[in-house]
Regions:
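Polysaccharide-binding and catalytic clefts of secreted carbohydrate-active enzymes
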Residues: 2-164
Length: 164
């Protein structure tokens, strides 16, 4: 289950409720796409696949925090490069270890309901989240393609949704 900007882990019952970096979610999302594609691969009435619906959840859980650190290491290579890119000397926010990096939410540098005091971490977290959601799409797409390489696969996004 996903954790919102305020740090609250949600429970069952909402329309979008999965963390895109949850290994459990990914396992079952892939399995579901695989089983459906296997069953309907040769059905002539299936002309295309719609994967997920309106991707766009931004999760702030421990899975995301750990994956964000890995994403940052890949992008910046060193803590010094990260500190420079984010101008972390400002207000004495220098980080000395990758484990010092926390998700930018209301429990860390939050200002208001959706932004933080440091643009660098906020922008990178949105980029990371976009990459995480893209990985989920590709995972489901590839599961479908393994049964029907030529089928059209699509998604839909909300035109005014700013998080991707």
């Amino acid at each position: 289950m996903y954790t919102d900007y305020e740090g609250r882990q949600h429970r069952f019952g909402q329309r979008h409720n999965a963390c895109p970096n949850s290994l459990v979610y990914r396992k079952y999302a892939r399995a579901l796409a695989d089983k459906l594609a296997e069953r309907y691969a040769s059905n002539p009435h299936v002309t295309c696949w719609h994967v997920n619906n309106e991707y766009g959840i931004t999760c702030f859980c421990d899975n995301c925090q750990n994956a964000f650190r890995v994403w940052l290491k890949d992008k910046y290579k060193t803590i010094d490069a990260l500190n420079k890119a984010w101008n972390m000397e400002f207000w004495g926010h220098t980080v000395y270890d990758w484990d010092d990096v926390v998700v930018p939410n209301a429990l860390s540098e939050g200002i208001g309901t959706e932004k933080t005091a440091f643009a660098g971490i906020s922008i990178d977290y949105r980029r990371f989240n976009s990459d995480s959601v893209l990985e989920c799409y590709k995972m489901e797409r590839d599961a479908i393609r393994s049964h029907n390489a030529d089928v059209v696969i699509t998604i839909n996004l909300m035109g005014t949704f700013k998080d991707l």
